[in-house]
């Protein structure tokens, strides 16, 4: 049976961030994920997880100036030291919270700029990050993101991601498989679930269009959940969606799985 992680950056907006751990646990979730924990000390995050017996499945390394529009540093020229400092900070949080996966965001890449130059930066930084994380027993993941939600994002397709992973050549660099983004950019989700099996330690879901609950829109998730079971997927499935209304009221899709 699939295992679901509540995304606390999007779900349970009815309460403040630190109270969302309690809310997720009360709803029946056994794990959580979120974008960034850095507004709170690592000890505070760890305490909330332990109190609610929650696993932290995934979070992102420091993305640069998120409020100012930046969306990662790994493929950004002249930002190597800032990127590395951010990775080290993320590792501290991961150790405190016993999280094993860190998403390393590439950032934006202006149209017309030589993308091969960005790819060289990206590969060098990912090698450094993967080695740093390996020393801490962690796995790095990269995620193709659709061009509608984040125009100009450096990495958009699973094929691109797999080519980058191959070029980096580190066993602890894997694919973050977000079905919402892949549906928008590529489709053919069931085939990709099978062909990419073994390369993704983390999956994320949302309905399309709208990025709401997974039972809203064109994607038939029950079929895909059964397919994950069929191929023996053991990782978490992150619920990275924006509830259309009250979070709990929108969990009808999850009752089959003991949530809501």
Predicted feature residues:
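Short phosphate-binding/catalytic loops that engage adenosine nucleotides
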Residues: 29, 54, 138, 233
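Short amphipathic alpha-helices and their capping/turn segments at secondary-structure boundaries
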Residues: 38-56, 86-97, 123-134, 190-195
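Short secondary-structure transition/capping segments
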Residues: 43-47, 69-72, 114-117, 153-155, ...
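Histidine-acidic metal/acid-base catalytic patches
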Residues: 1-28, 38, 89, 98-100, ...
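N-terminal small/glycine-rich loop or linker at the start of catalytic domains
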Residues: 1-9, 58-73, 106-110, 145
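Conserved beta-strand positions in the central sheet of alpha/beta enzyme cores
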Residues: 33, 57-60, 103, 141, ...
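Active-site acidic/histidine proton-transfer and metal-coordination neighborhood
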Residues: 73-174
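Glycine-rich, proline-tolerant flexible connector loops at the mouths of alpha/beta enzymes
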Residues: 33-52, 60, 106-114, 149, ...
